[in-house]
């Protein structure tokens, strides 16, 4: 039967499980055979143990990704989730390869580190897509809130004005890391080829030291903007339980980075001095980092499985082909649009021109909600007409809404706005745009 038939959801999961079992039957004996042929030392033992953790990590992550593809009912939310879930297998396999072949570690590790910027970006997309569906005009919601001061260590800086300014700067803070990280990665590769990189060696003569500082500042600022964004909109984000999701992303990104720095400090201090089968002590530091990541990714896979579960997206009547779901996972048109829009907004700021508003009335509806723009089409009323899923509690948010099938926000039941509710005050303050307030259906 063709892939577009509705029964593909029945056979795709058993097929993936079967392929994985076949891979184990073929791969494990080969690894054992190579292990017996090689001289078994610390390096080989570390590689073999790390491989065991990789074999346990991959099925957990791929199963979560597969379940989201099978129940791909809310593209705006599930597309960034799938991209985030790919982080664990990419980190795991990448680190295992780098551990086995130290000479190419610099190349595979830089690809891994580049993906972490992509993950932070997609987590921001996930939060924004949920919020812009729930609160079509997020800027008005922010303007109605009390002024948020900066968090430590920037508490002495002037606060960002609530509304478009705060949104713009939080998005810019996250997006800058997705640009800085690939640029520093390319510089690192060039420095490695010219022999001036010196990975793991803190020295003013090595490019690695300066690139670590640049990446660290960029990463910390991106995470700071995420924390500030969550702090301001904590109440609106509560229905999707963002704390566990945020910790999953933050722990993987921060722990992997700082443990690499900590290991490099131990090497510089002479605590790690034995080279075993490695050529130099810096290679030992890189190998130790890769080994630890392989172990940590197993724990991260378990955490991701529960934090980014597919269950809230299960619907009784699901449509769509497996081919469409698979292609949607690789679609990066939203990233190109966001970066392009951000460059234009920065250019307008530099030239002293007004920035484009994030919330226009005539934005075209499509599958995703752009990171730097949103729609005024209100999916809440559409969500209220969808039968609740027995497995989920925020079903309906993130549905692909079209003007032909979605009523406008002016049809929102008046019961949603009580006389003493914040929404009623917001509507009173903005009588010209009553459909752009945040509807707290979860309260």
From Swiss-Prot:
Q: Which SMART domains match?
A: Solute_trans_a (SM01417)
Note whether Transmembrane occurs among the keywords.
yes
Query: Sorted alphabetically, which InterPro entries does this protein's record hold?
Result: Ostalpha/TMEM184C (IPR005178)
Q: Where is the composition biased (Low complexity)?
A: 399-411
**Stored Pfam families:** Solute_trans_a
One GO cellular component from the entry?
Answer: membrane
Described purpose of this protein according to its UniProt entry = May play a role in cell growth.
Q: What is this protein called?
A: Transmembrane protein 184C
**Which lineage?**
Eukaryota, Metazoa, Chordata, Craniata, Vertebrata
